[in-house]
Structure formats: structure tokens, C-alpha cells
């Protein structure tokens, strides 16, 4: 901070004082600091200080705001109001000039994307961000607010419109004198820069008044957009960061320094990023608030359509087409895509074509819209130049997808066949737009448009046709997409599958004037068959919902059925209504499953407006039990069941021919009676039952133990970890240990077993008819008092082989008892698992010595 203010600010005005005035200023400054109760500065230091040294002293002893307030008051005391008035006026004048420039530039940018005003669409977000960034009451700490959301959802559009309304004085009144916007995709092209350099790039004239801009850092808001576009070193030490606004650094180091409050810590920050990147960085930055951006709401989408269509009835008809198609409605939550979709439908309707057909799938609408962009107005077919231009654009797009580039310079365009003379055309039709940071750099209208063009490349060409060695062949492309290796690839694989549909193939053939290879679909199936084989080492890495969305976009019944029948194991995680539609469609085409996992989270309870439709889809999903008769393993995870939802599930499973061997219900909540669920357990010849994280009441445990005590029960593995078992549960489980002849593994970790509960279990374990081999008691609130009872099972019970006691407070006394029992010649235990961090230093030393003599001990070193 000291070096910061020595470069600008105070010095700028002190230079107007002569030697006598400057000394008088120093005397009054010392007095004013004393009067204000600020941190004192030695008069000797002040007296001898130059203007630069005094700036350093001031900043060292006061924060930026206090230093400026004090300085301005002293200027007034010595009768130099002219200086303070001019400084205030110049600050206001520069800010006014900057606001006008920003408004003009951003309004122009938005008008190229939208022919309608969308500024008012975000009013709720403006209000919310103002509440987050403007301190309440006397609070004066700078804020760091994070906006997270999926790529392309509209975070950048929101931020740019926020800057427009700020430039008009509608938000942050008197809070921020300047707002500066840095996009990571853009600025990463600079090898090195200082913060002053980045600010100067935003200024309307070549010379920015840097001293004045940085003189009040608490009145600065820095917007850092698209953190996912930059490489961040989260292990970087403070000593490797930058502390001076004028110091040139690699851009990622510079922005890291800003994010970590090493430069201008008094300033506020507004950051946008993808959810995945925020998850990686959230422990690295000290943010004050997080807001998830979900894009346009239904009323915003409706407003967009009605703003574009002159006829209200046609507007409503077009909107209804989108509202009835959940996938198109979902992509319309991204403002740019919403406008693109509405424009496409408008053009189709005005051309006398049926808009329904292009709403078949998302790919269908994108194909129609993007091909139409390259067909001249009133023409039936594209020109040869248009064909070449779109083809070259596909080369550019796929290179960017593989090299993680979304901002392209003119060299990249020329390398892919796009000449300087082509650029105005691409800008005019709206498929490219100029980068905000550089007049000679360009981006696609939306990330999904780049993905679509990249997918089209693989329909038109082989990777061998591309000069970039980083563009890989189609198998690697699809493997990368299905395994989510590149998180920014959202639609790429889906568009590729969608373009294989016969209708889309016909559109491409009509546009480019030649037939596409029919071999591609057959080759794709052979590759999927290989990848989806249960013996393939990467089969479990495939993201099921990505795979499902690809098949859904393709909508080829025979192909989808064949692809689904390649999979014996499927793990479905549905997070919304759209996921339910896609999952129901795909699951209705398969009959080869042996292992099925479903996570519905709380969607079936939250989506109130779609409750009826969701239940229909839930019927379709649950019918998987009727079509797949060989399901042996069923997993339900992170799901909330209400009564109608569970009854549907119960009915299909009960009436199926499945012979379940393994049933998993991890973290499942029942908003209904669990009696039917427990009946399911009884209905099957189960061998493994996992109920981890699922709440079990006293009566639930009683019913479960009654089932376990039946002679025909074959359950070998029982996992009741973190089930909130109460003190009465241990007597029921003790009976199970006495009577059940099949149970080999019992996990009751993360329950309040305590010493008394364990005593009851130990009494059962010492009986000769107990069959248990392994017992996990991790984090059961056990103390050394239980160890005598537990040690007795080592010698008196001949079946018990493994015990896990990690995360309990056994102490030295308990440890000593256990180790002594393990030395007994009659001990049949194979493994006793403890955790080093649970013991004090003396106990740890004892434990290490015991480990050398006793191989039964297994020690965890983790925390």
C-alpha cells in the first residue's frame, strides 16, 4: 500500500505547495491526526519527510479513506480550498467522462446482440447486487461478491447491463466512482501487464488520470468476468504476488493479487465464474457473498418474445412452442440464446414455414438458424462463398474447443481460412462479435454457437483435414465429452449426435451441396459398443446424463435402443425437470441392465408447477424394473420420497421379475411411512443392504431387526452408518447378532452408540452362535471405558476378524487394554483399525511401538 500511494494521489496536490506551505501543512497534519484519534506519526519523521516519504508515512498509519479525508481538511485549514475544490471537481469530471464512454460502448455492444432493450430484464438482480456490494449502516469493509452459474447462462450480459445502469446513475449512487471490467478470456492474451495498464485499456483517451482514479480505492469496483478462462495457481505464496499497481506481472499473477486483496485491498470486487471453477477456488479467496445466476425466468423469456414480435398472438404462439419443449425452454434461460431462438422462429414464421418442425430438438433449431444466417435474404440457397465461410468457421470453432480458446485474433481466423474481408460479413450476420478488449479479436455469439460449429466440423471433415495438431479424432472427442474431461464442453457431444439425425443431415446436404457419409453412424455405434462394454476400464467414468442427452438429441429409435442395450450398469442423477424428460426417454429404450442407480434429489417435491408431468415421467423411469428383468443391484441415493412418489416406485419394483441381491438407500429421506420400504427388504432374497445416511426411527429399527431375525434372511452385509440410531436400537441389534446366521459385516459408524450401547453388543458377540466377521464402529463416541468389554470379544468370540475404532476417544488406558488382549494366544482378530490423530503424543508413541510387534494393528494417519 505504501508504494501505491507514493506513486500518485497526495503528491499530485502537495506539489502545488511551496516549501513554507508544505512545512505548515505538516504541522497541521500532526495536530489533525492527534485530534482524530488516528495512529500517531513521529514529528521527527514527518518534519524530515519529502512529499513521497510523507505519502508513505500517511498510508502506513491510516487507511486510504482516512488519509484522504485528513489531507483535504488540512488543505482547507491552510486556505487552499482551491486545491480541494479542484480535486473534487476533477474527480467528478473524470468519472462523468468515463461513465459516458462506458455507456456508449456497452450500449453499442448490446445493440449488436439484441435489437431490443433487455436492460430492464435484470432489475431484480441489480437490486440484489446493490444490497450485497453496498455496506449496511456503519459497515465499511470492502466486498467481494461471486456470481456463479453454468457457462453461457448470461453472467456477462448481466454484468455489462449492470455497468450501463451504473453509468446512468441508477445503482451504487455515491458508492463507486469507477467500475472497471476485466474478462479473463480477453486479458489472458496479454503476456504481462500492470493494474494501471488494464485500467488504461478501459479509458476513453490514451492517458488515464491514474493518480486520481487510484486516490480513493474504496470507491473502485473491479469486475473480473469468467474466472474459468484463466489458469490459477492456488498454491501461490503471498511473496509471489504483486503489491504495486504500477508493477508489470503475468496477467494471472496480477489478477490473483487483486483477488487475494494484495493490490488495493480497500476496493470492492464482483467476480463471475462457472460453478466448477468456483468450487476449485472458493477456499483460495475471501469472498463475502455468493449468488447463483440461473438466467432468464419464464416472464423474461416471454417478454423477449413479445418485444421481438409485433403481433402479440404470433408472439404468444411462438413462446408456447418453446414453453412446451423443456430443452429449448432451458437453453432460452441464456439471454443471448433466448434472443437467437426467438429470432429464428420469427424468421421461419415470416417466411411462411412451419416453426413446429425446427423445435423437434435443440440441435434442429440451431441447424436451421445458423444455416439461414449464411443464406442471403430472399435467396433459396447459399453462395459458394457462404458455404466456404461457414466451413472455415467450423475449422476455427473446433480448434478453439480443443485449445480452450474462445477469443480469436486475426491470425487464428486467417489460419482457418477466414480472410480480413470476411470479418464484416460474420459481424453483420451476428455469428461473431468483436471482443470488448481488442478491436482485432473476435468471439462467437455464444459458447453454444462455437460448440455447434465445432460439432459440425466432425460431420463434414476428418481431424486429418485440420492443420492444428491439437484437434483429435472423433473417438477422443466423444470420450472427452462423455467423461467431462473438458468441463466447458456443455453441448458439443449432444450437437454431434443431434446432427446425425436424418432431418439434420438433409439440411446440411442441401446447404453444402453434397452427400454426407452414412458410415459415421455405424462407426459411432461400434465405438460406443466398445466403450460401454462392462470390461472397458473407462466405462465407469462415463457421465450417464451426458450420454443420455446425446441419445435424446439424436432421437433415432433403433440406434438409441442398441446403445442403451450396450450398458449393463447405469447411474442416473436427475437435477431438474429437463433431466427427468431425457432420463425417461432413454431408460424406456433399454432392457439389459443388471445394476441400476437413481438419484432424484428433491426435484419431485420442488418442481410444484410440473408435479403432474413429473409423476408421469417418474412412472416411465420406474418402469425400468419391468423392462430389465436381470437387475440384481439397485441404488437409490440423495433422494427425497413423498408418499405418491414412493408408491409408484414400490408398485413397479414389487410387480417386477427382478431378483435383487443388493439394495442401497444412501441418504434417502422418506416424507411418508417407511413400512412399504421395509416390506421391499423382506420381499427379496437380499444379500447386501446399505442404508447409510437414511434416518431410521425406533420403530423402523424394530421392523428391520424383525426381518433380520427371520430364518430365511440371507443378508450378509448391513450398513447402518449415520442413520441416527437411538439408544433402544442396540438391544434390537444385539438380538440380531444372537439369532442371525448369515450376517458377516455390520457398520454402525457415525451413530451415538456410546459405551453402554457397545456393552450390549459385546454381550451378544461373546455368544457362540454369533456369525459376525467385521464390525465398524467409527465415530461412535466411545471412550476407554468400553475397551474391557470389547477386548473380551477378541478372545471369547472366534468369528470376529476385523474391527474399526477410528475417530473415537479411547485414550491411553483403552489402547493399553486392547493391545494386551491382542497379544493373547486365543485372539483370532485379523485387523484392528485405529487413527493416530485420536491419541495424545504418549499414546501415539506407545501405538507405534505396538505396531512393530503386532501386525493386527492398522493405523490411519489422516485427520
Swiss-Prot record:
Keywords: ATP-binding, Inflammatory response, Leucine-rich repeat, Nucleotide-binding, Repeat. ATP binds at residues 149-156. It comes from the Eukaryota. InterPro entries: DAPIN, DEATH-like_dom_sf, Leu-rich_rpt, LRR_dom_sf, NACHT_NTPase, NLRP_HD2, NLRP_innate_immun_reg, NOD1/2_WH. PROSITE patterns: LRR, NACHT. Belongs to the NLRP family. This is NACHT, LRR and PYD domains-containing protein 4B. It comes from Mus musculus. The gene is Nlrp4b.
Amino acid at each position: 500500500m505504501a508504494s501505491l500511494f507514493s506513486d500518485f494521489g497526495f503528491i499530485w496536490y502537495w506539489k502545488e505547495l511551496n516549501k513554507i506551505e508544505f512545512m505548515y501543512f505538516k504541522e497541521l497534519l500532526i495536530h489533525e491526526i492527534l485530534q482524530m484519534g488516528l495512529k500517531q506519526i513521529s514529528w521527527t519523521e514527518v518534519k524530515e519527510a519529502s512529499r513521497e516519504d510523507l505519502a508513505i508515512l500517511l498510508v502506513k498509519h491510516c487507511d486510504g479513506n482516512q488519509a484522504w479525508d485528513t489531507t483535504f481538511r488540512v488543505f482547507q485549514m491552510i486556505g487552499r480550498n482551491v486545491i480541494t475544490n479542484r480535486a473534487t471537481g476533477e474527480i467528478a469530471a473524470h468519472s462523468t467522462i468515463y461513465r459516458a464512454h462506458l455507456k456508449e460502448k456497452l450500449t453499442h455492444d448490446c445493440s449488436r446482440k439484441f435489437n431490443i432493450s433487455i436492460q430492464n430484464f435484470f432489475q431484480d438482480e441489480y437490486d440484489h447486487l446493490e444490497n450485497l456490494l453496498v455496506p449496511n449502516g456503519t459497515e465499511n469493509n470492502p466486498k467481494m461478491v461471486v456470481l456463479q452459474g453454468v457457462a453461457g447462462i448470461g453472467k456477462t450480459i448481466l454484468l455489462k447491463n449492470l455497468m450501463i445502469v451504473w453509468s446512468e446513475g441508477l445503482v451504487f449512487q455515491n458508492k463507486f466512482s469507477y467500475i472497471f471490467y476485466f474478462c479473463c478470456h480477453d486479458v489472458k492474451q496479454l503476456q504481462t501487464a500492470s493494474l494501471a495498464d488494464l485500467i488504461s485499456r478501459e479509458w476513453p483517451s490514451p492517458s488515464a488520470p491514474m493518480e486520481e482514479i487510484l486516490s480513493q480505492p474504496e470507491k473502485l469496483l473491479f469486475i473480473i468476468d469468467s474466472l474459468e478462462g484463466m489458469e490459477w495457481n492456488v498454491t501461490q505464496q503471498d511473496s509471489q504476488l504483486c503489491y504495486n499497481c504500477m508493477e508489470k506481472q503475468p496477467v494471472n499473477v496480477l489478477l490473483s493479487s487483486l483477488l487475494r486483496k494484495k493490490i488495493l485491498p480497500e476496493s470492492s470486487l464482483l467476480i463471475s465464474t462457472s460453478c466448477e471453477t468456483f468450487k476449485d477456488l472458493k477456499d483460495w479467496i475471501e469472498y463475502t457473498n455468493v449468488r447463483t445466476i440461473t438466467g432468464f425466468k419464464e416472464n423474461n423469456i416471454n417478454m423477449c418474445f413479445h418485444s421481438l414480435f409485433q403481433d402479440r398472438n404470433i408472439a404468444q404462439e411462438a413462446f408456447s412452442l418453446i414453453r412446451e419443449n423443456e430443452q429449448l425452454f432451458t437453453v432460452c434461460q441464456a439471454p443471448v440464446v433466448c434472443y437467437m431462438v426467438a429470432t429464428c422462429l420469427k424468421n421461419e414464421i415470416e417466411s411462411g414455414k412451419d416453426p413446429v418442425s425446427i423445435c423437434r430438438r435443440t440441435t434442429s433449431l440451431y441447424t436451421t438458424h445458423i444455416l439461414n444466417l449464411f443464406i442471403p435474404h430472399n435467396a433459396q440457397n447459399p453462395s459458394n462463398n457462404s458455404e466456404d465461410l461457414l466451413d472455415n468457421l467450423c475449422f476455427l470453432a473446433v480448434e478453439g474447443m480443443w485449445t480452450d480458446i474462445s477469443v480469436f485474433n486475426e491470425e487464428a481466423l486467417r489460419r482457418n481460412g477466414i480472410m480480413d474481408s470476411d470479418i464484416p460479413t460474420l459481424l453483420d450476420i451476428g455469428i461473431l462479435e468483436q471482443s470488448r478488449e481488442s478491436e482485432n479479436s473476435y468471439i462467437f455469439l455464444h459458447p453454444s454457437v462455437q460448440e455447434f460449429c465445432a460439432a459440425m466440423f466432425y460431420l463434414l471433415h476428418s481431424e486429418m483435414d485440420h492443420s492444428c495438431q491439437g484437434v483429435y479424432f472423433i473417438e477422443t472427442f466423444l470420450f472427452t465429452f462423455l467423461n467431462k474431461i473438458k468441463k466447458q464442453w456443455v453441448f458439443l457431444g449432444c450437437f454431434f449426435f443431434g446432427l446425425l439425425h436424418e432431418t439434420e443431415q438433409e439440411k446440411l446436404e442441401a446447404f453444402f451441396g453434397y452427400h454426407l457419409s452414412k458410415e459415421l453412424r455405424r462407426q459411432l455405434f461400434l465405438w460406443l459398443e466398445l466403450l460401454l462394454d462392462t470390461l472397458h476400464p473407462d466405462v465407469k467414468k462415463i457421465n450417464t446424463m451426458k450420454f443420455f442427452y446425446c441419445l435424446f438429441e439424436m432421437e433415432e429409435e433403433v440406434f438409441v435402443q442398441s446403445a442403451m442395450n450396450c450398458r449393463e450398469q447405469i447411474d442416473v442423477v436427475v437435477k431438474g425437470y429437463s433431466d427427468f424428460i431425457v432420463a425417461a426417454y432413454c431408460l424406456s429404450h433399454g432392457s439389459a441392465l443388471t445394476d441400476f442407480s437413481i438419484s432424484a434429489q428433491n426435484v419431485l417435491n420442488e418442481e410444484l408447477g410440473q408435479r403432474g408431468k413429473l409423476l408421469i415421467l417418474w412412472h416411465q423411469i420406474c418402469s425400468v424394473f419391468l423392462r430389465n428383468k436381470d437387475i440384481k443391484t439397485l441404488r437409490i441415493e440423495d433422494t427425497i420420497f413423498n408418499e405418491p412418489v414412493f408408491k409408484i416406485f414400490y408398485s413397479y419394483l414389487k410387480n417386477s421379475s427382478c431378483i435383487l441381491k443388493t439394495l442401497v438407500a444412501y441418504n434417502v429421506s422418506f416424507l411418508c411411512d417407511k413400512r412399504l420400504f421395509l416390506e421391499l427388504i423382506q420381499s427379496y432374497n437380499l444379500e447386501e443392504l446399505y442404508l447409510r445416511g437414511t434416518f431410521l426411527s425406533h420403530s423402523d429399527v424394530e421392523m428391520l431387526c424383525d426381518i433380520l431375525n427371520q430364518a430365511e434372511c440371507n443378508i450378509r452385509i448391513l450398513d447402518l452408518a449415520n442413520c441416527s440410531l437411538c439408544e433402544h436400537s442396540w438391544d434390537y441389534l444385539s438380538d440380531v447378532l444372537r439369532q442371525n446366521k448369515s450376517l458377516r459385516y455390520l457398520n454402525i459408524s457415525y451413530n451415538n452408540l456410546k459405551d453402554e450401547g457397545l456393552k450390549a453388543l459385546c454381550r451378544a458377540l461373546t455368544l457362540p452362535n454369533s456369525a459376525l466377521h467385521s464390525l465398524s464402529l467409527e465415530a461412535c463416541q466411545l471412550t476407554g471405558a468400553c475397551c474391557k468389554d470389547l477386548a473380551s470379544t477378541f478372545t471369547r468370540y472366534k468369528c470376529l476378524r476385523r474391527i474399526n475404532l477410528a475417530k473415537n476417544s479411547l485414550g491411553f488406558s483403552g489402547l493399553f487394554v486392547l493391545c494386551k488382549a491382542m497379544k493373547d494366544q486365543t485372539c483370532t482378530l485379523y485387523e484392528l483399525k485405529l487413527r493416530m490423530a485420536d491419541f495424545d503424543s504418549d499414546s501415539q508413541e506407545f501405538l507405534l511401538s505396538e505396531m512393530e510387534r503386532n501386525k493386527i494393528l492398522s493405523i490411519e494417519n489422516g485427520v
